[in-house]
């Protein structure tokens, strides 16, 4: 299986060869389609922002679907994807811990929008059967095709699901994403997934954890080409 080092080298080589994909806005990207690798490092390019990681984790724990509730200054990227009132879809804490209907939208509430306690479903499944293949936290939902742009937002959830398998007492975490930005996206998402994995590892008394990262489109934006080294 490939490692973060292999993925890093892929992007370095693609940049040197000027193999770019141009998106709908005319911006160049370097893209790896169908990426799959052992997430054995917390960052691919660039340095960790521990302060932001802590603030985002606190927001995830709050399960708030409003970006104005992020502690400290709200990052511009969250403001850009939120609706006019600050609401988004992608609070990952809400995705796995919420057992409630989203009260921010009465239309969606009437449709029964909730995520039904994904974390506890996985915990209970593996507590009852450590060999199970059914321990999956489902992040996105079929209505995302309509939800992503409701009320002016632009937030089509990037994480599809995460599967957890215990083998030889090691917790294997298989992350499945539709899209992931190599620079900021990966390192912040890794920090979140590693945190959740650590909770399960301890709760289920596993002997270590391993994260496998699967992404439909793993990419570097043109503005970050200078970090590819």
Question: PLM features: what roles do these ranges have?
Answer:
Residues 1-229:
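Terminal, non-catalytic protein-protein interaction segments that mediate quaternary/complex assembly
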